[in-house]
Amino acid sequence: METDLLIGTFVNATTNSEYLSPFLLKHPIGGKVSSEVEQVVRQMAKKFELDGYEVSEIAEDPINGIELQKGFYLISGAETVVMFQRMEKQLQRQMTRFDMELMTWVMYQSGLMVTGADYARVAGDWDRYAKAMMQLHDTYDVLLLPTVANTAPKQDAYSLDANLIEKMEHIHELSHEDRQEIVWKMFESSVEDTPFTQRMNITGQPAISLPVGRSQEGMPIGVQLVAAKGREDLLLMIAEQWEQDELWKF
């Protein structure tokens, strides 16, 4: 069973605690967070509350997850091109479809169409995301959110359909916009399950995933703690406390 989009909830420390810790459940790219994952995150928020924290809610994620993800693909494509250009120089020949598996070929071909202006725009967006999270941490010390939106998938969960594979094979014939659409479709199902970790790769914040829950089928469920740059100590402090409280589940 799955739930619809959820709003973010922030946990404000009372005088009994030194730190302020928000938690966020809203799916960054418009998908769904499973009810079991939601339950575990709320249980950990409840622990904050029982430890003397006051829970309140906010309506909006400070970062546009779809915008962030699309920019991530643009930069990844451009960096894939740079990687293969270096290989071409070493090998003294052009890279071809037969040098790599299909998904890498798609990223390579998408990157060939990325302009300097595209790259500069996304780089500016990333600075804006980092600033938004820095402002969040001006008020709140540690962010609590799911590690993933659902429990571990089956091995074939992210198999690509034949129609998409055909388009991927001919991506070099498509426009810049169509190439980016192919990249989005290629990763869409997997990113719907794993939408919560990308922002830290971009903003440079430290994060830690802790195994604090299990589904009815016995699958592990983690929550993620995120701090401001340079504050790994807060994450390790909370992780140690939760371990001492025997909250970890293996």
What feature does the model see in each segment?
Residues 219-228, 235-236:
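Short, well-ordered beta-strand elements
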